[in-house]
């Protein structure tokens, strides 16, 4: 059986962030692609099925595109410069549990990615031992 590629789709306006995430995720064994908006994922459904999405978008954009994104909530990481209790609550109600404070710490990203469950036929990144817990939320410098 042919092994499917692990895709990581990156949505961020900051070119430096995109370049950094590309480099980090390629090191972790992902094929990466930068996207400008969620509509680009519509054409790539099969790749998204076996991958994950990292995005820095406003909550309003997430709510608008939620019907489309709902099926990937378990492999969606929201990156944001400001993590508040209100934001965390709104995202949890939507089914999004992975929130990372920007700038993204590569070691924390590795922990978060390690906890993602990829579908059958998609080889998950091999990072060694699996950590505890299933979801990470970074608030300030701490992981909650």
Give the predicted meaning of each segment.
Residues 34-52, 60:
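Acidic, metal-coordinating helix/loop segments flanking the phosphotransfer/catalytic sites
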Residues 86-87, 104-113:
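C-terminal output helix
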Residues 80-99:
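Alpha4 helix (beta4-alpha4-beta5 surface) of REC/receiver domains from two-component response regulators
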Residues 15-33:
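Two-component/phosphorelay signaling modules centered on CheY-like receiver
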Residues 13, 79-83, 103:
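Conserved active-site segment of CheY-like receiver
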Residues 120-144:
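CheY-like receiver
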Residues 40, 62, 82-86:
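Negatively charged, flexible loop motifs adjacent to catalytic sites
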Residues 42, 61-74:
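Short amphipathic alpha-helix used as the core "switch/output" element in two-component signaling
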């Amino acid at each position: 059986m042919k092994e499917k590629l692990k895709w990581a789709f990156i949505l961020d306006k900051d070119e430096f962030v995109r370049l950094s995430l590309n480099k980090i995720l390629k090191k972790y064994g992902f094929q990466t692609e930068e996207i400008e908006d969620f509509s680009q994922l519509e054409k790539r459904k099969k790749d998204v099925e076996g991958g994950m999405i990292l995005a820095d978008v406003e909550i309003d954009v997430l709510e608008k595109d939620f019907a489309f994104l709902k099926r990937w909530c378990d492999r969606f990481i929201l990156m944001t410069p400001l993590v508040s209790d209100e934001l965390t609550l709104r995202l949890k109600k939507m089914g999004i549990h992975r929130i990372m404070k920007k700038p993204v710490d590569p070691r924390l990203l590795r922990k978060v990615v390690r906890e993602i469950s990829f579908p059958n036929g998609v080889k998950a990144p091999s990072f060694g031992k699996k950590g505890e817990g299933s979801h990470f939320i970074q608030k300030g410098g701490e992981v909650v």
